[in-house]
Each structure stands twice: as C-alpha cells, then as structure tokens.
C-alpha cells in the first residue's frame, strides 16, 4: 500500500506522511461487533501508572476481533476491509454461511469476496486457519496461539508474521521463527492463520507533529536530563550536565542499556531454542 505525502503548506506538514486508505471498502463498522472502550491512561486498578506516556486521545469504539478462529468447517466470505482505531493492522468482516458475522485481522493480499475457512486441517490459503501440526514447513503465519484455544497472541501487528520451521519427531511441538529472530517451540495443537498481517507500510509513516500522537493517546516522553534530581538519576546540574554515572539509568535507578529484562524463572524459557537477535 502506498504512502501519501503532503505539500509543505505548514512546517508540520513538510515531512508528514500518511497511509493511503483506498484499500478500505467501508467506514461504517458492524454495529453488533462494536462496544464502548473505557480509557485507562496507563493506570492499573489502583490508579498507579504502570505504562508511562499514555493518556488522552480520540474517543474510539472497540471492535470485537475473533482471535480464536474456532468456527470450524464453516465457509466465510470476506465482506469488507475496515480501519480499526485500536490497532495498526486493518480488519475484515467475515460473513459465514450460517449467518454469523465476525471480524478477523486482515491478512496481506486479502480481497473482498474471497472465501476462508477454519478447520483442524485445510488448504494452505491466505486467511485460512488450522492447527500447527497440520501445516507444512516454510509456511508464513500470523495470529498464532501459545496455548490451545486461548486465541492468537503472536504476530498480530501490521506487517508481522512468523515462519513455520518444522515439527518434532513425536509431533507434540513445532518450531517457529519470530520476526525478532527468536526461534521457539509451540504446541502442535495451537492454531495459526496462513499469511502475514496486512498494512505493512504502517512503520514508514512520519507523524509530522506531536499533535497527531496526542490524537492516538500517546503523551510526551521527557528526557531524564531535563528533570530534577529527585525525579530521575540523570536530572539536576547546571545547564546541560552529563549523566554523572558509569552508565545511563532508568527512572528507577537500574541500568538502561545491555541488561536482560526477561524473568529467569519463566517456565517457557525451556521452549526457546535461540534468543532473539539484537
């Protein structure tokens, strides 16, 4: 999908780019599949900030997405391709022959009128969903489960995918390679959808001005060196002062660079064949 640029009529428009939304077929979502989304602004149930730089943003309705793809052996037809304000991937509305409607993530190359199906084993066709143990080697996948029946958790953002590498001798586990370069094992009973997620040019968008990020609910990221010493380890000093420590620090006084952040006690560590590449 092409990237749209703008004439520099204002300073913020000079380098600003946008996605070309001509691929979308409607701007009206299916009413039965939307609900109100409450804002949390990065706070938990006690009001404590757990994720910084979140808050504000335009009011949006949540689209109920079918990540489980558990409607087996019933053919569905792609009715629309739509924008979803809650994610960077597009979504498409699927009309099943039994009358039910569901939203799914829109894979790359999907078109209105195409037919898709979910089953234990089916054709290797973009949009079809099946169990990993029945997928041939080398297949590109998205919306991949980590636990059978829980719903897709991996490769759900725009342009992302995982590659199917092979199966164990006993068939219990399969091996996949993630976009990060990590190679890991997943249960063969888990499901995944064929193809990669669409809207792959999303990463190339230049937002142009701070205000566009505010519309998205993203607040400013303040440099530690611009803070006071009681707010950040880099803060304080006269004028532009250096860090003043051996290494850059996080706001909580831990080393910011080159430190492994994964919990060593995680049970799934034994399933990782090769760590992600930096």
From Swiss-Prot:
InterPro entries: NA-bd_OB-fold (IPR012340), Rib_uL2_dom2 (IPR014722), Ribosomal_uL2 (IPR002171), Ribosomal_uL2_bac/org-type (IPR005880), Ribosomal_uL2_C (IPR022669), Ribosomal_uL2_CS (IPR022671), Ribosomal_uL2_dom3 (IPR014726), Ribosomal_uL2_RNA-bd_dom (IPR022666)
PROSITE patterns tied to this protein: RIBOSOMAL_L2
GO molecular function, one term: rRNA binding
Annotated keywords: Ribonucleoprotein, Ribosomal protein, RNA-binding, rRNA-binding
Family annotation (SUPFAM superfamilies): Nucleic acid-binding proteins (SSF50249), Translation proteins SH3-like domain (SSF50104)
Pfam entry (one): Ribosomal_L2
Domain of life: Bacteria
Ranges where the record places region Disordered: 223-278
Cellular component aspect of the GO annotation: large ribosomal subunit
The UniProt record lists the keyword RNA-binding: yes
GO biological process, one term: cytoplasmic translation
SMART domains documented for this protein: Ribosomal_L2, Ribosomal_L2_C
Comp. bias intervals (Basic residues): 261-278
HAMAP family xref list: Ribosomal_uL2_B
Recorded family membership: Belongs to the universal ribosomal protein uL2 family.
General function of this protein: One of the primary rRNA binding proteins. Required for association of the 30S and 50S subunits to form the 70S ribosome, for tRNA binding and peptide bond formation. It has been suggested to have peptidyltransferase activity; this is somewhat controversial. Makes several contacts with the 16S rRNA in the 70S ribosome.
The protein's assembly and partners: Part of the 50S ribosomal subunit. Forms a bridge to the 30S subunit in the 70S ribosome.
This protein's name: Large ribosomal subunit protein uL2
Gene: rplB
């Amino acid at each position: 999908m092409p990237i749209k640029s703008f004439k520099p009529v204002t300073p913020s428009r000079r380098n600003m780019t946008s996605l070309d939304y001509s691929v979308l077929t409607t701007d009206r979502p299916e009413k039965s599949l939307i609900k109100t989304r409450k804002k949390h602004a990065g706070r938990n149930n006690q009001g404590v900030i757990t994720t910084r730089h979140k808050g504000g943003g335009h009011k949006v309705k949540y689209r109920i997405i079918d990540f489980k793809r558990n409607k087996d052996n019933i053919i569905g037809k792609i009715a629309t391709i739509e924008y979803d304000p809650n994610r960077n991937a597009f979504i498409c509305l699927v009309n099943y022959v039994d009358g039910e409607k569901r939203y799914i993530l829109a894979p790359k190359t999907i078109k209105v009128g195409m037919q898709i199906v979910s089953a234990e084993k089916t054709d290797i066709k973009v949009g079809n969903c099946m169990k990993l143990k029945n997928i041939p080697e080398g297949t590109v996948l998205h919306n991949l489960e980590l636990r059978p029946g829980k719903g897709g958790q991996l490769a759900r953002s725009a342009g992302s995918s995982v590659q199917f590498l092979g199966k164990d001798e006993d068939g219990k586990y399969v091996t996949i390679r993630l976009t990060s370069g990590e190679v890991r094992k997943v249960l063969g009973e888990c499901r995944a959808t064929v193809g990669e997620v669409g809207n792959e040019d999303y990463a190339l968008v230049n937002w142009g001005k701070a205000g566009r990020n505010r519309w998205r609910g993203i607040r400013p990221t303040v440099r530690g060196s611009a803070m006071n010493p009681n707010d950040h380890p880099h803060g304080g000093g006269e004028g532009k002062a250096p860090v003043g420590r051996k290494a850059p620090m996080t706001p909580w006084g831990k080393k910011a660079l080159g430190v492994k952040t994964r919990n060593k006690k995680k049970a799934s560590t034994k399933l990782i064949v090769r760590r992600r590449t930096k």
